Curated annotation (Swiss-Prot):
Name under which the protein is recorded: Probable transcriptional regulatory protein Veis_4238
GO function terms (MF aspect): DNA binding
Keyword Phosphoprotein among UniProt keywords: no
Gene Ontology CC terms, in alphabetical order: cytosol
Superkingdom of this protein's organism: Bacteria
Length: 239
């Protein structure tokens, strides 16, 4: 199927991650802690922890740091307790935004998220105000030039829901969250390594922003991403 390309947004996001690796590691360590406490340290029985470790390895986090966080989360040692909170809001041009956070102080976090929205001419919404515009799914994105036929054949045989060709040649594979690992592993076994692989909130429809509106939206997204308690930011804007 044809679809809008996410390539420019992915490249921008990867560039920011490279610039702020320390912050990315902090977010991943929080995810490891929450996943290990909720489901234990046995990787075979804890898919959320497996996904967190995949993120850690992709971010080049040292193995000893990963092990330390799992041991700390599953042992008797006292550590920080994190609460997962989702915020929703409206960006430039009415674009829908979801901000997923992990925090040890919800009052601090909601104040920081609200301030970021208002500072950039946007508004926080109520729970459920925009989340219906997104689909919880697995997503793998392959660079332009990848073989669409090969990706499609392997992905669909492994249980993918859809394979979408972007306007610039990038290929997007979508899965149910429960099927994400199996599809990713099948594609990797076939020698197909994605530029992006994650369980995400994918916008069902997009809003195109241009010029000054696009620049303002990007500043808002960057501000939300830069908050210490932010784990992920999802939106439906094409910039």
């Amino acid at each position: 199927m044809a679809g809008h390309s996410k390539w420019a947004n992915i490249q921008h996001r990867k560039g920011r991650q490279d610039e702020k690796r320390g912050r990315i590691w902090t977010r991943i360590m929080r995810e490891i802690t929450v996943a290990a406490r909720a489901g234990g340290g046995d990787l075979s029985a804890n898919p959320r922890l497996r996904l967190a470790l995949d993120k850690a390895r992709a971010a080049n986090m040292p193995a000893e740091r990963i092990k330390y966080n799992i041991d700390k989360a599953t042992g008797n040692a006292e550590g920080q307790s994190y609460e997962e909170i989702r915020y929703e809001g409206y960006g430039i041009g009415g674009a829908a935004i979801i901000v997923d956070t992990m925090t040890d102080n919800r009052l601090r976090t909601v104040a920081e998220v609200r301030h970021a929205f208002s500072k950039h001419g946007a508004n926080m919404g109520t729970e459920g105000s925009v989340v219906f515009q997104f689909k919880h799914c697995g997503q793998l994105v392959y660079a332009p030039g990848s073989s669409e036929d090969q990706v499609m054949e392997v992905a669909l045989q492994a249980g993918a829901e859809d394979v979408i060709m972007g306007e610039d040649g990038a290929i997007e594979v979508l899965t149910l969250p429960a099927d994400f690992e199996a599809v990713k592993n099948a594609l990797q076994a076939a020698g197909l390594r994605p530029e992006l692989a994650e369980v995400t909130m994918r916008a069902e429809n997009t809003i195109e922003l241009q010029g000054e509106d696009a620049a303002r939206m990007q500043k808002l997204l960057d501000a939300l991403e830069d908050l210490d308690d932010t784990q992920a930011v999802y939106h439906n804007a094409t910039l």
